[in-house]
């Protein structure tokens, strides 16, 4: 609320529609923030007591049979007593186990994480008539909610500052919103991803910090987003992609005896006696959506990792980035791709029983054999043999000839190709240049 809004609260007849909307918006924001904080505080304080109902921290079963059995049979040695104890006894919940002091402290910190900086959480142990029993009472006082006032991004390098301004509409922090560490973490993650997608390979989330002032304007937070102190020089440098090395291992051999050079790519593989590459370079190259000299981008390289995994020819595949050299002037990362080819063959045997509405019932069998990377282009060739037999179990016509039994058998051959073959569609295959 502005000072003018506060001054007219007692004179409702003087409120304009704009002021009413402003007050309603603030109330709605505070109610939502309160419900969110309440849910988190309840979770921090919740602990199922003795004879809890379905694990509830508030509702209990009237008769604590679990505790009765525990008290009656604890320490008994007979086999039946041990079985009864293990099956039905309930472990007693002690005050020391609940640790109300720590829970109250956690709940109080939770309030502050959601903008209730003056909030407090106290607890009291309430003894009952039975000296062995007690209850815990928590008192939560959230008090006033702090909201964001000014938000400034300071001390970032010139390029980083320009990137922040270009993506300003994507921010998660807005003036007037309740203070929330969830939103702070979301903004830190957003800035981190922005830097990583703009060439800053060594940038980390912890390089982004916050400074907050709650004194200048009561009830509000003057927030500054600043880089952390002591950031290494490599984190403030943009990196470009260099040469690519591919280590292609067979599933039964970890030797690389052959080499293939193609422009900026070097492939090491085991060609065996025939010297053939186990996976054609073209099939691999189609999934490398980058080129030499391109600025490093985390989103594109993550997509490359995903596409290589989805080729379904590797048991494991990973990307490694190696600095061209260790000098301060270096700004190039070479890529090293290491993949281990999966076993070439898969077999599957399936049985089934079918029952139809026309009264036919019977078993079915199928066996399929698949070969990965069948033609060294990430294809999958599958051959299947199947058969089934069905009996008619009911017939409205008398006589042996009225019963109709049927059988089916056959084979199928399929080829899964990792790329659509369509004239003129080549330009669409490199969708992430």
Language-model segments: which ranges?
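Gram-negative/organellar outer-membrane beta-barrel architecture
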Residues: 163, 277, 297-433
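Interaction-mediating elements
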Residues: 1-310, 332
């Amino acid at each position: 609320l502005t000072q003018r809004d506060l001054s007219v609260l007692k004179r409702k007849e003087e409120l304009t529609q704009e002021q009413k909307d402003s007050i309603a918006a603030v109330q709605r924001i505070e109610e939502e923030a309160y419900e969110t904080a309440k849910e988190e505080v309840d979770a921090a304080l919740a602990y199922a007591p003795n004879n809890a109902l379905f694990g509830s921290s508030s509702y209990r079963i009237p008769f604590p049979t679990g505790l009765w059995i525990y008290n009656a049979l604890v320490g008994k040695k007979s086999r039946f007593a041990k079985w009864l104890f293990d099956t039905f006894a309930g472990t007693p919940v002690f005050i020391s186990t609940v640790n109300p002091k720590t829970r109250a402290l956690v709940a109080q910190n939770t309030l502050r994480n959601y903008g209730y900086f003056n909030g407090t959480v106290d607890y009291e142990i309430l003894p009952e008539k039975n000296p062995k029993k007690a209850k815990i009472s928590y008192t939560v006082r959230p008090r006033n909610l702090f909201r964001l006032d000014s938000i400034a991004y300071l001390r970032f390098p010139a390029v980083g500052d320009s990137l922040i301004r270009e993506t300003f509409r994507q921010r998660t922090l807005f003036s007037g919103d309740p203070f929330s560490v969830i939103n702070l973490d979301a903004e830190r993650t957003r800035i981190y991803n922005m830097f990583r997608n703009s060439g800053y390979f060594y940038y980390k989330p912890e390089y982004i910090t916050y400074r907050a002032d709650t004194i200048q304007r009561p009830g509000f937070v003057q927030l500054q987003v600043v880089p952390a102190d002591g950031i290494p020089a490599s984190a403030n440098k943009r990196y470009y992609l260099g040469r690519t090395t591919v280590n292609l291992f067979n599933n039964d051999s970890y030797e690389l005896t052959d080499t293939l050079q193609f422009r900026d790519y070097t492939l090491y593989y085991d060609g065996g006696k025939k010297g053939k590459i186990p996976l054609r370079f073209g099939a691999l190259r189609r999934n490398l959506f980058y080129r030499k000299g391109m600025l490093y981008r985390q989103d594109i390289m993550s997509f490359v990792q995903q596409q290589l995994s989805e080729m379904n020819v590797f048991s494991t595949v990973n990307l490694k980035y190696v600095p061209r050299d260790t000098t301060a002037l270096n700004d190039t990362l070479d890529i090293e791709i290491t993949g281990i080819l999966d076993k070439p063959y898969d077999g599957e045997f399936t049985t089934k029983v079918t029952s139809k509405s026309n009264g036919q019932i019977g078993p079915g069998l199928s066996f399929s054999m698949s070969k990965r990377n069948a033609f060294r282009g990430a294809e999958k060739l599958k051959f299947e043999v199947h058969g089934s037999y069905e009996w008619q179990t009911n017939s409205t016509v008398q006589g042996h000839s009225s019963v109709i039994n049927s059988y089916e058998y056959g084979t199928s051959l399929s080829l899964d190709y990792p790329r659509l073959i369509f004239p003129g569609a080549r330009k669409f295959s490199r969708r992430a240049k």
